[in-house]
Each structure stands twice: as C-alpha cells, then as structure tokens.
Amino acid sequence: MISLFSYSKNPVKQWGQLQVKGNQLCDQTGDPIVLRGVSYGWHNLWPRFYNKQSVKWLKKDWKCTVLRAAMGTVIEDNYIENPEFALKCMNKVIKAAIKNDLYIIIDWHTYYPQKEEAKAFFSMMAQKYGKYPHIIYEIYNEPMEDSWESVKEYATDIISEIRKYDPDNII
C-alpha cells in the first residue's frame, strides 16, 4: 500500500533508468513504480507555461514525478510552421525537468502522422537528450483516422530513428 502513495522528491535519482517488464513500468532494479504528473497544453497555445519556473513549481507544489511537454504540430505557431519557436518552448521545459530531477515525456502532439517531420524531430531530441534517463518519448499522441497498419509503419520508422541515438529510454 505504501508504494501506491509514495512520492519521490528526486525520482530520477531514486528510480534511475526506467524499463518496462510485461505491462509494468519499473525502476532500474525492476521494481514496479507509478509516475505522477501533468501534461502541459500545446506549446503553441499556452507557451507562457513553458518555462523553468513552472517545472520547479509543479515538482514542489504538486509533487509531480513526471511532466509531459506537448509539442503541437497543428494550429498557428506549430512545429511544422515555426520549428524555432516550438523547439525553444520544448527545450526550456525539458532542460528544467532534467535539472529538477523529473521524468519528462517528449510528446509529438498531432492528429496526423507527419512521418518525415516526426523522424527529424525525434532524431534531434534523441541526439540531444538521449543520454539522460529522464526522457520518455511519446511518438504519436492522437491517431484519429489511421489504420493500424499505417500507425504500425509510422511507429516502426520513428522508433528506429530514436534507437539510432538512444537505446535505453522508454518509447
């Protein structure tokens, strides 16, 4: 019962490199854990929250152990139209999560595959942040009208790209 309500002040230091065993998220020793946290809204709709102060506050006040940085690929100022702005927002939160010893989900938040753009993005993220055990990749947030075959093909390609640079973090 204690593990259900446990909180880690420094989750990455305590749990280390995450792994999946069966259907369980586990710490570096193979013990099941539960991460607790929140998702930022799309970077292009709520950029004012993409800063180090919000990360620190969510850790301290909400006792988060994980955050999710949702990078929008549709609507104005999205990654496809304005990658510099998107990366600036994402990098602020990712760097702050690492500094504050939190896990961070890098989320490709879209309704459409955009495979080539996603491959380039995740290649960049894996090269930059793949050495940190804080990272979790979410490669396609909301497939809407895609067939299983197309989602599987997309996922296989994106996972292969990430694994070129990051063999360990959870996807």
Name each model feature, range by range.
Residues 1-9:
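Bacterial Sec-dependent N-terminal signal peptides
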